[in-house]
């Protein structure tokens, strides 16, 4: 919270749903108290969640649209491999099949995940230690140019970093050298974003409406977009000013190591979050950032939140045809896509 100059929220936000607008739009969400149990009793929590979902739907089946979110499955994929969870996924399939058959052909169903999972055994990235060894202070408020604040969002493959604006580039120089760091992203003075690795630098710009994008890189191309722009130019799909359309970039990068990177970075820079981070850090597979207390309870076999494909790409299936690849914002029901400002 920049106005109060302190980190607010924490684990209780997840449990309470406070200041999480999308939860208010759901007809079913895993109860807050139940979101604390999966790391202690994952399978029992999961099957209980399926039962609550089934009961809630049958009580509200007359609604024209029923929106549900199963939160326990996220924890399951942090703790187990996909192969280990196959019976649990089949149980979910049975619940959905039962609901669908009860609709007697009059019910449409859309299932999707909101992200992927690296499925790589993961450990904490020593970012805090790295910064402190280089003279930075990791704390809950920002007073001086060497102060850094990094909220803990669970255990995920990214870190949101807050600092004094004048310290951004120097801090980015330090972050790219930290163990486990893959990409460092921050807004630049040209109105776009700079993407850094330890061996390369990229600059991304976009038009006001987001329909056109420009990209350049020096050293090793951090987003692997130069080859994409070169191919689009050869196909005559770049404008005279060297920009690529948003649609062309999505089509060309949806299956890349960094899926749809231009739009995802642009959305970070322009999205509805009031207290946007000064720097985003995307971690390599095998690393996470977050509340360290969880590391003493369980071993993580995977996580999500990073830019790379396994953490990013989810699935979607439905009773109506879907395209081979689609952004989540284009997939979600209209009832869900009402934007609200949040802190």
PLM feature spans:
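Active-site neighborhoods of enzymes that stabilize oxyanions during catalysis
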Residues: 147-334
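Acidic, His- and aromatic-enriched active-site or binding-groove loops in soluble protein domains
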Residues: 1-10, 86-98, 127-144
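Loop/turn elements at helix/coil->beta-strand transitions in domains of secreted/extracellular proteins
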Residues: 62-64, 105-108, 180, 276
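His/Asp/Glu-rich, glycine-adjacent segments
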Residues: 1-87, 91, 212-258, 276, ...
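Short helix/loop capping segments that flank catalytic or ligand/cofactor-binding pockets
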Residues: 76-78, 120-121, 128-141, 170-171, ...
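Short, solvent-exposed loop/turn segments at secondary-structure junctions
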Residues: 71-75, 116-118, 285-289, 322
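Short secondary-structure boundary/capping segments
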Residues: 81-86, 122-132, 200-202, 296-298
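Metal-dependent active-site segment of extracytoplasmic phospho-/sulfohydrolases and closely related
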Residues: 92-127, 280
């Amino acid at each position: 919270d920049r106005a109060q100059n302190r980190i607010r929220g924490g684990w209780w936000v997840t449990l309470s749903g406070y200041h999480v607008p999308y939860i208010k739009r759901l007809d079913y969400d895993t109860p807050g108290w139940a979101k604390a149990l999966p790391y202690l009793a994952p399978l029992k929590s999961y099957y209980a969640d399926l039962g609550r979902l089934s009961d809630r739907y049958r009580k509200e089946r007359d609604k024209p649209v029923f929106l549900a979110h199963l939160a326990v499955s996220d924890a399951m994929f942090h703790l187990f491999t996909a192969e280990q969870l196959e019976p649990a996924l089949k149980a979910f399939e049975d619940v959905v099949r039962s609901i669908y058959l009860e609709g007697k052909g009059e019910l449409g169903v859309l299932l999707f995940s909101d992200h992927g999972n690296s499925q790589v055994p993961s450990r904490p990235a020593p970012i805090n230690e790295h910064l402190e060894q280089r003279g930075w202070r990791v704390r809950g408020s920002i007073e001086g140019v060497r102060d850094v604040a990094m909220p803990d969002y669970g255990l995920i493959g990214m870190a949101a970093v807050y600092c004094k604006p004048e310290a951004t580039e120097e801090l980015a120089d330090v972050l790219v050298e930290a163990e486990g760091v893959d990409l460092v992203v921050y807004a630049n003075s040209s109105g776009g974003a700079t993407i850094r690795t330890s061996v390369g630098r990229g600059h991304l710009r976009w038009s006001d409406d987001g329909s056109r994008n420009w990209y350049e890189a020096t050293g090793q191309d951090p987003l692997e977009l130069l080859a994409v722009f070169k191919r689009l130019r050869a196909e005559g799909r770049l404008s005279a000013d060297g920009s690529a359309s948003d649609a062309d970039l999505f089509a060309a990068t949806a299956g890349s190591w960094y899926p749809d990177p231009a739009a995802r970075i642009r959305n970070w820079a322009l999205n509805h979050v009031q207290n946007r981070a000064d720097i985003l850090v995307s971690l390599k597979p095998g690393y996470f950032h977050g509340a360290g207390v969880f590391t003493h309870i369980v071993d993580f076999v995977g996580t999500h939140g990073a830019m790379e494909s396994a953490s990013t790409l989810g699935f979607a299936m439905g009773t109506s045809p879907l395209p081979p690849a689609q952004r989540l914002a284009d997939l979600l029901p209209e009832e869900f896509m009402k934007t609200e400002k949040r802190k």
